[in-house]
Amino acid sequence: MISRAAAPSSSIASLSSRSLRAQAPAARSFATVQDNAPPVKHYGGLKDQDRIFTNLYGHHGADLKSAMKYGDWHRTKDIVLKGHDWLISELKASGLRGRGGAGFPSGLKYSFMNFKDWDKDPRPRYLVVNADEGEPGTCKDREIMRKDPQKLIEGCLVVGRAMNANAAYMYIRGEFYQEATVLQRAINEAYEAGLIGKNACGTGYDFDVYIHRGMGAYVCGEETSLIESIEGKAGKPRLKPPFPAAVGLFGCPSTVTNVETVAVTPTIMRRGASWFSSFGRERNAGTKLFCISGHVNNPCTVEEEMSISLRDVIDRHCGGVRGGWDNLLAVIPGGSSTPVLPKTICDDQLMDFDALKDSQSGLGTAAVIVMDKSTDIVRAISRLSTFYKHESCGQCTPCREGSKWTMHMMQRMEKGQAREREIDMLQELTKQVEGHTICALGEAFAWPIQGLIRHFRPELEARIREYSKEVGGNGPYAGGWHPEARAEGKLISPGM
């Protein structure tokens, strides 16, 4: 017990309690926390006046007169006369990144052809536009070619001036007959108006535009395969270096870039880099075309602000997921080659390069494939494996053999005809393919499978156990591996 003598007097006690209260920090109320917190910025809800592709839904004609009425070819002469240095610096300041999937900074990419003493090089220089849109789920470039062809042609002139190119070659997917027809008609109109060709737009700059139609090979979407195809060779990737900027089309300096990346450039030059960079998060600037398909009420292609949330773009423009957001199973966010994301991640997912990379997926071409709970997710990824096996050019052994093995293994996983340890083997196989092929097709068939195993492994394991019960397999026969399975046609194994 504390003695009375040791106890402080009431005056001393009140003084020390006041001093303690003065030293202690003030309690932070809810309002105080909110006042000191940085404001949260929400992305999306792009206004019509900020949309670059004003004719995405074909509300007006695709002819030159209609295009000029809506702002195309406005003061293009002034833009071209500013020279390549200004164009490159403006593109770098805008933060534009490639819209074909890789997301490489466009201003930096276009500067590669302006190497030291480039003007002393007697070789012609080419801009190559990749319009070979073959990624399953992707349908943005074809809308530009069908509805806004003049925007693409004007973009070719501006981008070509930035890299001092003499001509542009547009490589169009072979199945795009209507798109090629509309685009050729638009090119003819531009030639007749003096906008391209000799003394393009009255600038003294000569620039021609040509169309080259492909023959349907998916691998020709890779830049060096595309170049090989234009040259009349088999569409197979080249080893790099040398890079196309040094030795490209016909052995001349060339830059291969996406349709959307080219088409947005003139608008950026007219409105300014600061306008474009005001949209989206840092390093993810601008607007983007999103192709939303699958189990939504209104599938569409729409232009929206970068960094918009996945749920917002689906609810705002597609009428939501079929059966409601709670009926969502998974989403492939950037075309068939990007890893699938489950609903738990999709709830708060932002749609830009860095945010999707943090979620172990990718923006890719921004082709959003929505799958509700009625989807057989294993079968969906198995179908993609079949597609990539069919489209492999066979040049690289890891891709040629790996795509075949993964296709057969996914067909087995689809039916549960496997052992649980084979899931790990399949994942290891896909990781061994990454980085060991000339082009990115190896990663394209590996990543969807990795995403499936990462997020839906319990589904694979459940199928294996279910099939094991059906055939009465235990121990060495689990998963259907019994001696008569092959003869009965119940087992699908590599090599059958």
Swiss-Prot record:
Membrane-protein topology = Peripheral membrane protein
Free-text comment on the cofactor: Binds 1 FMN. Binds 1 [4Fe-4S] cluster.
Q: Where does [4Fe-4S] cluster bind?
A: C393, C396, C399, C439
According to its UniProt record, which reaction does this protein catalyse?
a ubiquinone + NADH + 5 H(+)(in) = a ubiquinol + NAD(+) + 4 H(+)(out)
Name the InterPro entries for this protein: ComplexI_51kDa_subunit, NADH-UbQ_OxRdtase_51kDa_CS, NADH-UbQ_OxRdtase_suF, Nuo51_FMN-bd, Nuo51_FMN-bd_sf, Nuop51_4Fe4S-bd, Nuop51_4Fe4S-bd_sf, SLBB_dom
- The question of whether Lipoprotein is a record keyword is answered with no
Which metal ions or organic cofactors does this protein require, according to UniProt? FMN; [4Fe-4S] cluster
Similarity annotation: Belongs to the complex I 51 kDa subunit family.
Q: What is this protein called?
A: NADH-ubiquinone oxidoreductase 51 kDa subunit, mitochondrial
Native organism: Aspergillus niger
